[in-house]
């Protein structure tokens, strides 16, 4: 789309509610060469960073300085069988990064099930979703003096 930057292994600085942060995009782990280091080139070490990527399998490569990684790809496995779990999750890590908010070593990953399907048009006990992620600053905003 015109005027919208594509963040394939690159980052852009943003400001929201007077809080500066970086948004970095990492190419799809399975579909293309991806370079996390290149995606974070130029990002100030002290600035908060949010990484967006298609496939959560890249999460082990994301450095601890990244505040949040957001991904999709797995569709939550599309099928969840009570007592058996998710028999098929398109990930080298199985159910580990299949769905939801995952915290590992103090790092945060959010994986959405999305609204579509892959291979077969079937979902069972894994409803489609459009996620709303609320991000709050750990640093309180200074109040203007009166």
Task: Set out the residue ranges of the language-model regions.
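Short, flexible loop segments at the rims of nucleotide/cofactor-binding pockets, characterized by
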Residues: 26-31, 48-49, 86-90
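Active-site-proximal loop/helix segments of hydrolase catalytic cores
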Residues: 31-45, 51-71
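Residues at the C-termini of beta-strands that transition into short coil/loop
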Residues: 10, 27, 113, 134-136
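Extended active-site neighborhood of metal-dependent phosphoesterases/phosphodiesterases
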Residues: 1-35, 41-43, 105
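Active-site-proximal beta-strand elements of phosphoester/diester hydrolases
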Residues: 20-29, 50-54, 108-114
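Conserved beta-sheet core of the metallophosphoesterase superfamily
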Residues: 56-131, 140
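Envelope-exposed proteins and targeting segments
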Residues: 2, 19-22, 47-49, 65, ...
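Non-catalytic terminal accessory segments
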Residues: 139-146
């Amino acid at each position: 789309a015109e005027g919208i930057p594509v963040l394939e292994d690159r980052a852009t600085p943003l400001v929201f509610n007077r809080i500066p942060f970086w948004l970095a995009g990492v190419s799809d782990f399975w579909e293309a060469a991806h370079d996390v280091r290149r995606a974070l080139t130029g990002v100030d070490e002290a600035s908060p960073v949010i990484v967006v990527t298609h496939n959560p399998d890249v999460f082990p490569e994301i450095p601890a300085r990244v505040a949040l990684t957001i991904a999709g790809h797995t569709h939550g496995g599309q099928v969840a069988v009570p007592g058996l779990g998710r028999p098929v999750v398109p990930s080298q890590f199985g159910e580990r990064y299949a769905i939801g908010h995952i915290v590992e070593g103090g790092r945060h990953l959010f994986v959405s099930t999305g609204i579509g399907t892959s291979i077969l048009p079937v979902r069972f006990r894994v409803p489609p979703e459009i996620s709303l992620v609320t991000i709050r600053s750990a640093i309180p905003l200074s109040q203007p003096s009166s």
